[in-house]
């Protein structure tokens, strides 16, 4: 059955090791493969309704007063669509990560987080197409991606595919960017200092769903894990 083929779109916020932001978020959105086209068309129709160019990328960084109507309606669409699920892992302080102790680098850690992100919801009777936002084409990055796929495959009877794509080619990848951006924004406590009222409205709209963005949320629609590193 085509409902048993699941597309998963993964991305991150503030994952670079040496950037100023200490909070890292890795997140994904998923839905049945046979719903991708209709959902994408719905999002494009929303853009048209709000006079946004159909090829304009949806991003958390683009949330503004002039576009608040679109982003609030997009958020409502996500919560009302029964086929969409979101999950995020928040690393509150990546500066505390001790990579040498675990014989890894930061890029390896990123793919470990992708594994933790997806392994949580794997079902034996489903196959998965996993798309990660394209960051780099290095040999090591490709190796880590293939290893991640292999580890996930060990927990699933059906085939798992994993590849990189660019976000501008996928409405669902862009929707994930929007939601994970909200999670990262809140966990960086920027909601306490921002002058961007539109972003505050998005945060408040999420909170009306009884979702707490800086605590573990075992929520079927909007799942959050606050990740704490093991000590060595």
PLM features per residue range, with description:
Residues 1-232:
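Phosphate-ester processing/binding pockets and catalytic centers
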């Amino acid at each position: 059955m085509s409902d048993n083929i699941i597309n998963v779109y993964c991305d991150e916020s503030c994952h670079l090791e040496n950037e100023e932001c200490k909070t890292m978020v890795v997140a994904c959105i998923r839905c049945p493969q046979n719903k991708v086209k209709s959902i994408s068309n719905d999002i494009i129709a929303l853009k048209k309704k709000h006079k946004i160019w159909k090829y304009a990328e949806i991003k958390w960084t683009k949330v503004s007063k002039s576009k608040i109507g679109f982003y609030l309606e997009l958020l409502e669409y996500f919560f009302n669509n029964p086929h969409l699920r979101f999950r995020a892992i928040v690393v509150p302080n990546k500066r505390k990560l001790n990579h040498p102790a675990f014989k890894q680098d930061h890029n390896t850690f990123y793919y470990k987080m992708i594994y933790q992100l997806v392994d949580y919801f794997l079902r034996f009777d489903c196959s998965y197409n996993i798309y990660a936002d394209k960051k780099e084409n290095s040999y090591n990055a490709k190796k880590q991606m293939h290893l991640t796929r292999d580890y996930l495959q060990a927990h699933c009877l059906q085939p798992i595919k994993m590849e990189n794509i660019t976000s501008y080619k996928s409405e669902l990848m862009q929707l994930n960017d929007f939601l994970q951006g909200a999670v990262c924004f809140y966990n960086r406590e920027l909601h306490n200092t921002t002058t961007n009222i539109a972003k505050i409205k998005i945060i408040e709209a999420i909170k009306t769903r009884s979702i707490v963005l800086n605590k573990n949320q075992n929520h079927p629609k909007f799942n959050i894990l606050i990740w704490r590193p093991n000590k060595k």
